Amino acid sequence: MKESTEEGKAFENASAEYVKDTSNHVRSNEWEKMAAMTRGENYVEPEKPKAFERIDKVNYYLGIAKAVSERGTCLRRKFGAVIVKNDRIVSTGYVGAPRGRKNCSDLGYCFRMEHNIPSGCMYEKCRSVHAEMNAIISADKEELEGAVLYLVGVENDGSITKKADCCAMCKRMIINAGIRIVVVKTPDSYKAINVDDWVVNDDSLELHEGY
């Protein structure tokens, strides 16, 4: 017992500059650990420093597009768009009626919903201008050429729209605007679309996709 006590004191003396007289120590090296153990104290491994986390640029702009969507007035779902060129935001857009006209949120009803019109069909019956369109008309032509458009759709329950896509009308405007890439948020990640693919696949402009 005497030898054990002397050994314990030796460990304490060797690590005296680190060890504090408390009942539960957090140590940073083996000397501290052994000294605590010889005194019958609990040793708690120090937490490893967490790696610095920084959101990537794509999700950064998608996050902004999601925030923009909160201004939307559509009763079905909200969409937000952000156009970026040379790492600079050119313009933003959300779903809403033309200036001076009442929004669906003001009227309290959506004609397309009341008549069970599916997404991607009969947009002439919709009061609103789409997010992509509003973003495009808010930017100068020079700023649109070669730009990237970020798009996020949000359902009424707050979840990300599962199969979000630009409608045929918005695709035509995006092509003519000279936008190079469209990035669409998905529930788990995002998808990047080369706008040239819409030009090559001409039938894509006739599909019933969109809001």
Description of each model-found segment:
Residues 79-87, 91-92:
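Short beta-strand scaffold segments in enzyme catalytic cores
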Residues 53-77:
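Short, basic/aromatic recognition patches
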Residues 31, 35-55, 194-195:
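Secretory/periplasmic and organellar redox-cofactor proteins
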